[in-house]
Amino acid sequence: MVNAVKQIPTFLNDGANAIEADITFKGAVPTYSYHGTPCDFGRDCIRWEYFNVFLQTLRDYTTPGNSKYREKFILFVLDLKTGSLNNHEVRKAGENVAKGLLENYWNNGNNGGRAYVVLSLPDIAHYEFIRTFKEVLKTKGHENLLDKVGYDLSGPYWPSLPSLDSVHEAFKKAGVDGHVWLSDGLTNWAALDDMARLKQIVERRDSENGFISKVYYWSVDKYSTTRTALEVGVDGIMTNYPYVIIDVLNEAKYKDKYRLATYDDNPWETFKN
């Protein structure tokens, strides 16, 4: 939802504890935080920043002692637009994103940003991205930073979404056991569906053979949709209007059950009510 650095403080001031950015590629090189048209209704689709600059700015907002530091800003999602990449480019993209984060966000392990990171990929066939990403951090001597990283494999959406068993197999191929965030959703101008897929994901998360740590839903901009998503049992909500989520969380029905996550909460641990 946030692709320009000037938008970051606006979302944080409205109550967000996390942000999502769309990362576009030139070949295998992550180049811009940019979505383009069409996008959610009411959203500025053409805001952008250079990838490295965006990461450096995120580091400022999540590094204690920095003048821009925000204690409540604890996580960001990189929506990686790898849909058009071939298998070789996907592997190289994983390498390049790892190097970009290591240098520009984690500051090569020297007092870098402390936020958790979720890497979201649009195709379960792109599991090699994750394998390469992890291997780069290990080779560079920063395997410990993988403790801060989660993964989302959620597509492709056309012609139909993959089964959850297929998603699970992709994570196994990626070498991922835990740290799994799984998303579902619709653009905010689409007619609201019955959330059947979302309910299926939540049920799988809570099952004995569940492989999912957290479930998040997008794009939730209405009070009514927020309430419905909470009733289904999501762990996170992606919105263009953070204050809407804050307002609902403060309602009598929800305030004793839900709250915004803090840095001390484990983003890879499934919440048990």
UniProtKB/Swiss-Prot annotation:
The active site is at H35. One of its GO terms (molecular function) is lyase activity. GO terms for biological process: killing of cells of another organism; lipid catabolic process. The keyword Lyase applies. Its main location: secreted. It is an enzyme of class 4 (lyase). It catalyses: an N-(acyl)-sphingosylphosphocholine = an N-(acyl)-sphingosyl-1,3-cyclic phosphate + choline; an N-(acyl)-sphingosylphosphoethanolamine = an N-(acyl)-sphingosyl-1,3-cyclic phosphate + ethanolamine; a 1-acyl-sn-glycero-3-phosphocholine = a 1-acyl-sn-glycero-2,3-cyclic phosphate + choline; a 1-acyl-sn-glycero-3-phosphoethanolamine = a 1-acyl-sn-glycero-2,3-cyclic phosphate + ethanolamine. Its cofactor is Mg(2+). Binds 1 Mg(2+) ion per subunit. Its EC number is 4.6.1.-. GO terms for cellular component: extracellular region. Disulfide bonds join C39-C45. Expressed by the venom gland. Mg(2+) binds at E20, D22, D79. It is found in: Secreted. Keywords: Cytolysis, Dermonecrotic toxin, Disulfide bond, Hemolysis, Lipid degradation, Lipid metabolism, Lyase, Magnesium, Metal-binding, Secreted, Toxin. Belongs to the arthropod phospholipase D family. Class I subfamily. Dermonecrotic toxins cleave the phosphodiester linkage between the phosphate and headgroup of certain phospholipids (sphingolipid and lysolipid substrates), forming an alcohol (often choline) and a cyclic phosphate. This toxin acts on sphingomyelin (SM). It may also act on ceramide phosphoethanolamine (CPE), lysophosphatidylcholine (LPC) and lysophosphatidylethanolamine (LPE), but not on lysophosphatidylserine (LPS), and lysophosphatidylglycerol (LPG). It acts by transphosphatidylation, releasing exclusively cyclic phosphate products as second products. This is Dermonecrotic toxin. It comes from Loxosceles laeta (South American recluse spider).
